[in-house]
């Protein structure tokens, strides 16, 4: 009775399908929403709406990307103190959320400009598996480096040498 299982991963849904005795465990399994959204709705039954910041977290975590502010909020949070000890968690009103979005928009603009410069300096057109592609020697952690040229190439390749091995990421 003291256990509440809240999850949004496909493997958990499959586990319940394979072990029907788990159906009786109190909680919610729903792949459409993030665990943050599921936890909020579980503990705030009857709430008129889910706070916007939780909607943004859910949109990002489930890769839905339906909300216009999702990426900006993510990068704004990355540029903030979001540690467990941070006071931020006590003050996430819609106004604070929008301030974080504005901060993230600045971060995204910086990334956009840096990506263009990096592609110009370290990118080159080549062929991969019969496809014309853009390759770039980069340690970037995101496919966003290719955003300015995404529609020009069917395949983009990011690669780097770590000193021990080559790492490759393919984007289509």
Predicted features by range, described:
Residues 79-96:
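Active-site acidic/histidine proton-transfer and metal-coordination neighborhood
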Residues 96-130:
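Oxyanion-binding "anion nests"
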């Amino acid at each position: 009775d003291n256990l509440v299982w809240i999850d949004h991963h496909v493997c958990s849904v499959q586990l319940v399908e394979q072990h029907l005795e788990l159906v009786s465990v109190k909680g919610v399994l729903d792949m459409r929403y993030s665990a943050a959204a599921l936890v909020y709705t579980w503990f705030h039954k009857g709430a008129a709406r889910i706070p916007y910041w939780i909607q943004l977290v859910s949109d990002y975590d489930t890769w839905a990307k339906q909300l216009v502010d999702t990426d900006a909020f993510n990068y704004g949070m990355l540029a903030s103190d979001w540690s467990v000890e941070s006071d931020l968690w006590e003050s996430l009103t819609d106004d604070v959320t929008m301030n974080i979005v504005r901060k993230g928009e600045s971060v995204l603009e910086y990334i956009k400009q840096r990506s263009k410069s990096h592609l110009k300096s370290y990118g080159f057109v080549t062929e991969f598996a019969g496809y014309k592609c853009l390759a770039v020697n980069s340690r970037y952690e995101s496919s966003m480096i290719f955003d300015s040229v995404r529609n020009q190439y069917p395949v983009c390749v990011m690669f780097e040498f770590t000193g021990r091995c080559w790492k490759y990421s393919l984007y289509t």
